[in-house]
Amino acid sequence: MKIDIVPTPGRLLKRYKRFLADIQLPDGAELTIHCPNTGAMTGCAEPGSLVYYSDSGNPARKYRHTWELVETPAGEFACVNTARPNQLVGEAVDAGVIKELQGYPLKKAEVKFGDQNSRADWMLSGSSELPDCYVEVKNVTLCLHGRGYFPDAVSTRGQKHLEELMSVVRNGKRAALVFCVNHSGISVVSPATHIDARYGALLSEAIEAGVEVLAYKSEITPGEIRLTQKLEVTPFDSEAF
């Protein structure tokens, strides 16, 4: 995925009100940009980090610039724009990168599914040999000692999605949860049970019920992101803290 990044990054001054961030440009000027991420962004919003952002070119927008990537003080890249993971996974399915989700001629975004009338990020269909597959995508940027965790804050929405995926399996369809790992420092993924205990419990329940849980890591450079590497998903380890 190509991203039209403004050539010169800024330095993060602060993130606030969830959807806003102030950055300092190389000439010393300050700019307020849109932060498309409702999570805690732990480790990805440290003052002084390099912020790579895009420009919509739309003067009618109150905040025409959007925060896309961050380079942490440790030199690691992360994609903080939560609109990107769905696109990345869709591209990776089309390119054959996610082997587990091949064999479907049709792919549709934002399809209603489940008992609670949620929307799947993708529905794969049209196979004469495989049941339709409902795919939920989650962005993973919380990195602690090389391990990625999801969620980075208590997520009732994430809990609901796991319940919906289990209902899909009960009804004879396929359900897949794809952790889109958008932090260069992550080498393995686990549920953040220390942050959201119910999510961790539901993930274990979902795996037992037959929901397929996958993790794929992106290769990030300023201007381009693409999924390239499958990672292991392991249980939460309390001894890691």
Swiss-Prot record:
Which Gene3D superfamilies would you find in this protein's record? 2.40.50.580, 3.40.1350.60
* InterPro entries tied to this protein: SfsA (IPR005224), SfsA_C (IPR040452), SfsA_N (IPR041465)
As one GO molecular function, the record gives: DNA binding
Output the PANTHER family linked to this UniProt entry: SUGAR FERMENTATION STIMULATION PROTEIN A (PTHR30545:SF2)
Q: Which family does it belong to?
A: Belongs to the SfsA family.
The protein depicted here goes by the name Sugar fermentation stimulation protein homolog
* Gene name as annotated: sfsA
